[in-house]
Amino acid sequence: MNTTAGTTQKSQSKAPAKDLAAPRRNKIHPVVIYPYRQPGDFSDLEELFRMVAALDASRDQYARPITVVDRKTCYAMESSKPFIEFRKGTVAKYSDILDAWCVDTCQMWYSGLGMAFERGEPGDVYWLIPGDFNYGTAVGKDVLGRLHDLPQIVLELRNDLCIGEIETDHCNSKQLIDTYGTFALLYTWFPDEAREIRRYTERPRSEFFAVRHAFLQAVLCERWYPYEQTMVMLLRAVASNGQISRFFVGNISDLPQGKESLASVMQQIDRTERVLKTLWRERNQGRDGWAERYRVLEQQSEEVRRAAVLILQNLCQ
């Protein structure tokens, strides 16, 4: 009897040791969006993937990076030896490649963030990294040297969403589109939310952001728009009293010519209006008199959109 009791006591004294194991550290999941149009010069991508390689080597803090590549890009470059070598020797070496057929860039986000989310756990952070910026320049290298601070803000401050803001002057086409197009339309359809969003950022369509696990789960389970998804996430964060922050990225660009074409400007404004109209209907269609209110807002929105296109046509020349 004494032997049995002693054995039991010894077993019980060892059992709690399992409970002393260190809790899992929340990780950051990098999601790289490969350029839809492969640039002839690989210097920007080479610099970007030097950073990705460093992230991949820090597995205690970062999950294995994911790179989303549109299948149309692969087919367009299937006979390009430099592309094939860079894909195999660099992209696949330092990240898991997700090949996907995508309507637009935001669908690439959806695929990549969805894959990362399924690998993640509560408390993790998901970091979107656009691949089509001039990272090979002196300014771009400086940005890459501190871009990791963006997801760290979400991780340390327990924010739901952190938006990265590109530094631009008042004549920059992206700045002009957001001022005269995006925010003007936001104030038309969602005035209260627009005022709140502007407290946090001047770039409601930014491609740089990081998002917390629980907030991403909520967003993934709702309608995902093929464009202007950052704006949609900001609207959701404001509506749910989420915690939003911003990070100043720096003066980098994804415009090789330095400015947008008029056709691109018009397309971006049209897309913004289309998303806002759809989102407003989804939120208000159960209310009394919503159809009449929608027609009034639609007329106002049309006037705002036309004015924005006219202003930007003159400013972007």
Give the residues covered by each predicted segment:
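Active-site nucleotide-sugar/metal-binding loop of Leloir-type enzymes
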Residues: 110-125
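Short beta-strand-to-loop acidic/aromatic patch adjacent to the donor-nucleotide binding site
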Residues: 123-136
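C-terminal catalytic/acceptor-binding lobe
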Residues: 227, 231-234, 238-317
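Aromatic-glycine-rich donor-binding/catalytic loop that engages nucleotide-sugar donors
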Residues: 192-204, 209-227, 236-242
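Acceptor/aglycone-binding surface of glycosyltransferases and processive sugar-polymer synthases
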Residues: 115, 137-210
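A conserved acidic beta->alpha catalytic loop
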Residues: 68-83
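Short, acidic, metal-binding catalytic loop of nucleotide-sugar glycosyltransferases
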Residues: 50-63
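N-proximal low-complexity "stem/linker" segments adjacent to membrane-targeting elements
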Residues: 2-53
